[in-house]
């Protein structure tokens, strides 16, 4: 008989997904899944990339959903109170929490461990890069570069606007014999894409040991030997400079990192910063320019922004 678990559903906005995921990771959550309507709309517009699409998902096109999975124990009510209060307080940090509704349901272990996989199919995210889950088959076209990925439930599937913009920027700016640093590497998707696009050496860093483990596993799936994954922050665990530093995080962290990051970029190198909500674009640009970066280009997709700046 399948074990029963408690599923906490938070109905929110795309803007608040990362913040709410962070709230859940501060509790005893055993798994997190994300349903982002922006990803769903993207997949509907690119039907050739999918061999399965559940039209019922479009019924929640204005609502993003974060689900956390818990064992039923003495601490659950404490976790639930913390989640509700933290979600309620997001407005104080300038984050649109959307509906902000929190619900609890009982589910079987099988339901949450594997069902999410059926919605995750190979997706072309740039001119060359196709993100392919490791359990799917895909007929590669001649010019395509395949990134094999098992994101697990803790990380995005690589189709979010912020990730797509980063990959497209890497595709444009990476040249042979270049070094790339990936800050907050998560599943390793940007590090892997950078290596497959021709970077000579890639270093990915993340403070989360789960991310470090996930990145290393995904690198093995792609048979790459020129990527190094380190646990910690860039300033403490990495030596040397890169031609490109990429960070797909959030605006406040990018602003905080900007001065330190400058010392890790070669003259003439680029800082690709994404994960920035449109309302924070000018704040990030201002900080970059104050620090000596020259804005090369600003890309926008939906409510998200990717800023590419340069050290001259």
From Swiss-Prot:
Reaction(s) catalysed (UniProt annotation): L-lysyl-[protein] + 3 S-adenosyl-L-methionine = N(6),N(6),N(6)-trimethyl-L-lysyl-[protein] + 3 S-adenosyl-L-homocysteine + 3 H(+)
Gene: prmA
UniProtKB keywords: Cytoplasm, Methyltransferase, S-adenosyl-L-methionine, Transferase
Transferase is among the record's keywords: yes
GO cellular component: cytoplasm
Main location: cytoplasm
One Gene Ontology MF term: protein-lysine N-methyltransferase activity
Subcellular location: Cytoplasm
Function according to Swiss-Prot or TrEMBL: Methylates ribosomal protein L11.
UniProt KW Coiled coil keyword: no
Family per similarity comment: Belongs to the methyltransferase superfamily. PrmA family.
Protein's recorded name: Ribosomal protein L11 methyltransferase
UniProt xrefs under InterPro entries: Ribosomal_L11_MeTrfase_PrmA, Ribosomal_PrmA_MeTrfase, SAM-dependent_MTases_sf
Disulfide-bond pairs as recorded: none
E.C. no: 2.1.1.-
Binding of S-adenosyl-L-methionine, residues: 163, 184, 206, 248
Swiss-Prot/TrEMBL GO biological process terms: methylation
NCBIfam families: prmA
């Amino acid at each position: 008989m399948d074990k029963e678990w408690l599923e906490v559903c938070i109905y929110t906005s795309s803007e608040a997904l990362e913040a709410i995921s962070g709230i859940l990771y501060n509790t005893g959550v055993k798994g997190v899944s994300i349903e982002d309507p922006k990803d769903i709309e993207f997949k509907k517009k690119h039907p050739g990339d999918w061999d399965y699409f559940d039209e019922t998902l479009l019924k929640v096109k204005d609502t993003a959903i974060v689900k956390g999975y818990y064992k039923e124990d003495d601490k659950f009510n404490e976790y639930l109170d913390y989640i509700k209060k933290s979600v309620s307080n997001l407005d104080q940090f300038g984050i649109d929490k959307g509906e902000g509704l929190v619900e609890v349901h009982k589910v079987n272990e099988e339901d949450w461990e594997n069902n999410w996989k059926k919605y995750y199919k190979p997706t072309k995210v740039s001119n060359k890069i196709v993100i392919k889950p490791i359990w799917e088959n895909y007929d590669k076209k001649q010019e395509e570069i395949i990134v094999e990925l098992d994101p697990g439930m803790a990380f995005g599937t690589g189709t979010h606007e912020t990730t797509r913009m980063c990959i497209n920027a890497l595709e444009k700016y990476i040249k042979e014999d270049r070094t790339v640093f990936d800050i907050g590497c998560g599943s390793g998707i940007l590090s892997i894409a950078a290596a497959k696009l021709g970077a000579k050496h890639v270093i990915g860093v993340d403070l989360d040991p789960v991310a470090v483990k996930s990145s290393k596993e995904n690198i093995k799936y792609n048979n790459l030997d020129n990527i190094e994954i380190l646990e910690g922050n860039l300033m403490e665990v990495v030596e040397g400079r890169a031609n490109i530093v990429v960070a797909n995080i959030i605006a406040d962290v990018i602003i905080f990192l900007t001065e330190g990051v400058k010392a890790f970029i070669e003259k003439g190198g680029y800082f690709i910063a994404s994960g920035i909500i449109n309302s924070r674009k000018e704040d990030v640009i201002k900080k970059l320019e104050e620090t000596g970066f020259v804005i090369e280009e600003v890309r926008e997709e939906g409510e998200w922004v990717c800023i590419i700046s340069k050290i001259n």
